[in-house]
C-alpha cells in the first residue's frame, strides 16, 4: 500500500525572502542594467537612465519578476496618492476658510492657500469674501467635503493624518511584497479570483460602505446644513451612528430599523434612498438621497458580480471558456487565444484598461456639469470649468497611452506563429482596408467641417449674412441631438414613470435652478453653431484614432519595412542608406498622436467654456431675468473662424492679459511663461540633430582651450529624445497656457 501525503488545501502562492533589501544597490545609478551601471561616457547616459528605469521588460525577460516589480510599483503609486490627498486635507485644515465657506457658500469663495509676503507676492491673496484673503481654489474639495458631512477643520486634520498613515502602510506593502513575500506568477494570472475580489471587494464593499456613510453621516448633516443650522450646533458623525433616535427625528422610518428590509417593505426607506432626479434647489447639486440610493444599487450589482467567477469551488464562469465561446459566423476563431494574451502580456492588459479608463474619465467630465454631484458645485464656475478641462485632458492622455501599450504589446509580446484566424489576426490581415477607409473618413470630415466655417467666414467678409450657415439664415440644426435631448426631457412620466424630474436639466423643459442669484443649471439649447463644432470634434477624434491605430496595426511590419518588429518599439529610421524610412516606429505614432489628441481636447474645452458662458452661466434678477456672462453670443459668433479668434480667444483673454497688479497676476505670468515653454518645444521639433552636434563640438573645443572640459563627453540629443522633449514641452506649455487663460477669465467674471 502506498501512503500519499495529503494534498495541501491551500496553494502556496508566495515566495519568501526572494530578493534581499540592499541600499547599496539602490544607491548605484542604473543598477538594473549592465550597460547603464558602468556609468557615463557621454551625456546620453542620463537620458538612457531615465528612459529605462521603469521599463521593466528591459531589465529581465522573466514574467514573474516583471509582474512583481509592477505590483510593488503600484503600492508606491498608492502611497504617493495618499500623501497627495493628505496634503489636500491638511491644507483644508490649516490654511483654508472652509468653516467660513460652509456657513455662506454663495458669497464666500473657497481658498486653501495663503501666500507669504516675501517680495510682495501677497498681492496674490485676493478677497474671497468673509474677510478672508487667499488664492481662490478650483479643485472642488470644499464641495466634496460638505457632501461627505465634514463640518470642521479638526475633522480635516484627522483625515489628513489618517491618509499619512495609509501612505506609510502602502510604502511598507510595496517593500514587503517584493522583498519579503513576493507573489508567484500563478497568483498574478488567476484572473477569476482577481475579478471576484476587485468586483466584490473594491467596487462592491467600497460602494456599500460609501452608501452607509452617506445614509448615516452625510445625509443628516447635510439636512441640517441645508436648513441653515450653524455647523457647530450639528451633532458629530459618531452621534448619528451610535444614536438611532437622532436619525429617526430626521427620517422617521429609521425607527423601524431593519424590519422593512426583511419584510420586503422597502418603500419605507424612500425617505433617504430616493429616486427624484433633478437638482436640490437649495444647493444646486444632485439630491444626496438619490446619490446614496445609487451607491447602494451599484454595491448590490458588484457584490453579485463578484460571485460570478469560478475559483476553488468549481462553480461559476471561467474567463477562458467565455472568451473561447465568443465567436460569430463571420469572425473565424473569435476570441480564442485572447485569454493567453491577456494573462502573459501586461502591455495588452494595460492597453485595454487605459482605453476603458480614459473613456470613462471623459464620461465623468461630461457628467460633472450636467449632473453636478456635490452641493454648491454648480454655481462655482471656476471649479466647473477646471473639473471639465482636467477630466478631458486626463482622458485624452489615457487613451493615447492605450495605443502606446497596444503597440508595445504588438512589438514585444505578440507571437504571430501561434495566432491564426482569431479576431486580432483577422484585423491585422485587413488593416489596409481599415486604415485607408479611416483615412478617407478623416479627409471627408476635415474638408467638410472646416469648409463650412470657411464658407461662413467668406460670406461674413462679403457682407452676405443671409448666405451663411446659422440659426438665422441657412439652418443646419443638429436634429438627432435635439431628438435625444427631447426624449430624455420627456422621460419622467413616459419611459421613467417613477422619476419626478429628468436625469439632467440640460435635456430641456422649462426648469431652471438658481442658487444665490447665480444660475446652477438650465436647459442647454443646441443649434447650427454646435452642429459645426461637433463636426470639428468628429474630425479631430478620427485623425487621432487614425494615427494611433496605424501605429498599432503596422507596429510589427509594413510594406515599407517588412521586418519592423526587429527594430523595436522606438527607432529613428531603418538604418543608414535607406532614405524615407524615418518616423515610422510605433513610438513615433504615439508622438504624432499626442499632437492630435491635444488638438481634439483643445477644441472640446474651448467649445465647453464658451458655450457655458454664453448659454448657461450667469446671474438671475429678482424678476427671474437671466443675464449670461457673454450674453448668448455663441450661436452667432462661433460659426466663423474669425468669431472664435475675436470673440472667444481675444475677447476672453483680456482678463489674463490685464491681470498684472491684481490678485490674478500669477495667471498673467503663467500665461506668459507657458507660452514660452510651448515656443521652446519648437526648437526641439524643428531642428536637426547634426546642427546641435556641430554646435556642441565647437563649445567643447572652447572648453578644451581653457582646460575645463568635462570627463563625460557632451552629445546632442538623439532624434527620439529630441522629439520626446519637444512633445513634452509642447503639451505642458499648451495646457498651462490654457489653464491660465481659463482661470483668470472665469475667476474674474464668474
From Swiss-Prot:
Chlorophyll a binds at residues 683, 691. One of its GO terms (cellular component) is chloroplast thylakoid membrane. [4Fe-4S] cluster binds at residues 573, 582. It is a multi-pass membrane protein. It is an enzyme of class 1 (oxidoreductase). It is found in: Plastid, Chloroplast thylakoid membrane. Phylloquinone binds at residue 692. Its EC number is 1.97.1.12. This is Photosystem I P700 chlorophyll a apoprotein A1. It comes from Liriodendron tulipifera. The lineage of its organism: Eukaryota, Viridiplantae, Streptophyta, Embryophyta, Tracheophyta.
